[in-house]
A protein has these predicted regions:
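Structural preference for beta-strand elements that scaffold enzyme active sites
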Residues: 61-63, 92-94, 128-132, 148-152, ...
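Auxiliary Fe-S-binding modules of radical SAM enzymes
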Residues: 1-8, 157, 162-230
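Surface-exposed amphipathic alpha-helices with a cationic face
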Residues: 85-86, 111, 144-147, 193-202
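Conserved Radical SAM active-site core
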Residues: 1-129, 138-144, 160-165
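Active-site beta-loop-alpha junctions enriched in small/polar residues
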Residues: 67-69, 98-100, 134-138, 154-158, ...
């Protein structure tokens, strides 16, 4: 289990490295070029030895695909990770995808074969497993058809309007980091408008530290649904 600078979780555990999404701003690809987690970033690799990290007894909020996209995982990889999650309900688990339709199909298949997924991901009631969709543009927001626990709008690349019926319980918002050519510097009004939309739907907002200077006194970090009480 790795400590992380990601400010909305306690730690990361990556059982898969690599992602075929080919995002220009992908920090995972940059890290892979330096540390060589997998041979070809566009071809995800399975690291089953990392499953043992879930068995840590100290409760944590764990991001399980910071170096991949869970929607691109093979079915058997997802099932093995679900096994480890169900066996270790002391933690809270968070996953992000740009491919919610593919992930939904895999989860439906898993749920049809086992009842214990409801223990961590019930239709109603407290969850121990949280799924979010990563969006950065209006086109991506418009394409969402799935109900999820949160949107991660990082990096925010342009103004975004979320249909009121699609607004999730939580928005995580962040600016692009790094030094990519063409890096987008967000405008404060883009973030202000997302906050207004969230407030109208009684949704929480968590701004990443990358927005602190831009937002000034309007910087905001509401309590996260997966926060571990200490």
């Amino acid at each position: 289990m790795n400590k992380t600078k990601i400010d909305w979780c306690d730690a990361t555990v990556n059982c898969v490295y690599g992602c075929p999404n080919n995002c220009e701003y992908c920090y995972g690809n940059v890290l892979n070029k330096r540390f060589h987690f997998c041979k070809d970033w566009k071809v995800p690799e399975w690291k089953p030895e990392h499953l043992k990290a879930f068995y840590s007894r100290k409760p944590r909020s764990i991001f399980i695909d910071s170096m991949s996209d869970i929607g691109t995982w093979r079915q058997e990889w997802l099932e093995q990770v679900i096994d480890a999650i169900v066996a270790n309900q002391q933690h809270r688990y968070i996953a992000l995808t740009k491919r919610p339709d593919e992930l939904s199909k895999k989860l439906i298949s898993i749920k049809s074969k086992r009842d214990d997924l409801d223990d961590v991901y019930p239709l109603f009631g407290p969850r121990k497993l949280f799924f979010g969709i990563s969006i950065t543009t209006q086109a991506q927001a418009d394409s969402v058809r799935n109900s999820v626990d949160f949107y991660s709008i990082e990096p925010i690349l342009e103004p975004i309007v979320i249909d009121s019926y699609k607004m999730p319980p939580l928005l995580i918002i962040g600016a692009e980091t790094g030094n990519r050519k063409g890096k987008v510097i967000p405008k404060k009004e883009w973030v202000d408008d997302l906050v207004r939309q969230a407030d109208e739907r009684h949704s929480a907002v968590f701004m990443k530290e990358s927005l602190r200077q831009l937002m000034g006194d309007d910087f905001r970090q509401d309590k996260l649904p997966w926060a571990i009480e200490r």
